[in-house]
Amino acid sequence: NSSKDRSAKLESLKLGNTKIDEINLRDYFKHIKVDFIKSDLDSMDMITLYELEDKFRSKETLGVLIEVLNGFEFDKLEKAHLNSFDKVYNFMNKYNYRLFEQTNVRTMRKAARKYEFHTIYGKNNKDWINSEKGQINFGDMLFFLDPREIENQISYSQMNKLISLLDCYDLSDVAFDFLENSSNYFDNVEINKEIKEILKKRIKSNYR
């Protein structure tokens, strides 16, 4: 498809614009609880956000890990709808999801590739070369709800899941802070204490 066709398709997938639900994520997950979303659709990740927008609006989904692109690499027509850094960031912030982590993949310019570097898509692929230097090409953004914000009041079970997710993504200090400042979610003092002790050990291990 041309850039014009692809942009038109993405525009049609925005909430309320879909006529023929080709992807059908919205209908498929309509009655399925989605606690966390991981999206990697090779530059088409805005489809995920548009299709599951109701999940973000209702605060059902606690977090998102999504691929993002350095949008200006594309022509102006495509840039408005692809998963550029600014497009994804603004969309998630609109529903009070905050950025907690961002990883970047840098691409060394072709003129400098006469040396041997680490290829991220196999030794025979010379198009993508990951480097500590060079221009950021793409990456991943990790968003979570912050339950300390008034707009993000979540249930006891959701808070348990959120703390577990934060711990899984090596954000134990954030989980501890949420727990410390959201005591109303944990009526059981003993459970509260035990979870804090586990998180403290995780935090300490990161600084040894």
PLM regions: where:
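Glycine-rich adenosyl-binding loop in Rossmann-like folds that engage adenosine-containing cofactors
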Residues: N1-I23, I32
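Intrinsically disordered, low-complexity regions
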Residues: S7-L10, F29, N125-K126, N192, ...
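Conserved acidic-Pro-Pro-aromatic motif
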Residues: Y28, I32-D173, S182
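C-terminal accessory extensions appended to soluble enzyme cores
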Residues: S155-R208
